[in-house]
Amino acid sequence: TYLGQKVRIMHEGNVVYGAVRNHGSLNKKELEITDIIIDIGAVSREDAMGHVACGDPVSFDTDYRELLNDRLCARGLDDRLGGYIILEAAKKAKERGCTCGIYAATTVGEELTKHGAAWCASRIAPTLAVVLDVTYTSDYEGTRAIENGEILLGGGPVFLHNSFSHKMVVERLEKAARNIHIKYQWENGCGRTCTDADAIHMAGRGIPTTVMSIPLRYMHNPAEVCSMEDVQGCIDVLAEFLCGIGSDICLKPLEG
């Protein structure tokens, strides 16, 4: 199938990399030529035509690739990005003299049982938890912001507001972003997050938990696309957040 595949475009002796867009609605119909659209990271028609032209040959590509405008195309960005951000943020926080104890974990079973996160949280019993995952963008053809909210690639880290997401932890993340002038986005929900946060927040006696997400195009496909600006924003915000936590932290809504 063409959908979700990484491709190489040969243009005037140079190679331009891209991804064939995919969306759930396309799996319900017989494909037409107009359904096959290639994303090269361009932000406008003029930007795209400066790098490719009609008639350029296209072939499949199997490696990770850097796209235009500091964007990355690869498989498994969900959730390798989360693991990378956690480690880089912890390292940066340590370099800045962070005094709180930090446990960084990459756990198994998130897509099925979430047992890895549940066991880890129960054993550590942290004061709070921030889960790093990815979220769907709504900025390409076939998506509808009116249904799922407006999430933009390059729009910054995404903070979650829902019944599983601890309000005071979210507010601290938002404050951290404002402190270092990092733009951010929101997404809302009313139930499960479909991330490890669903298990962590119920572990032990209950753990104040939230999710910080990286905007991602074409999730669960061989050619996922992210913005490295968003990735760096998540690293910086998480490091700032960690440096702002002291032993006197209070997350009780009526006392903090």
Describe each region flagged by the PLM:
Residues 1-256:
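N-terminal hydrophobic/helix-forming segments and targeting peptides
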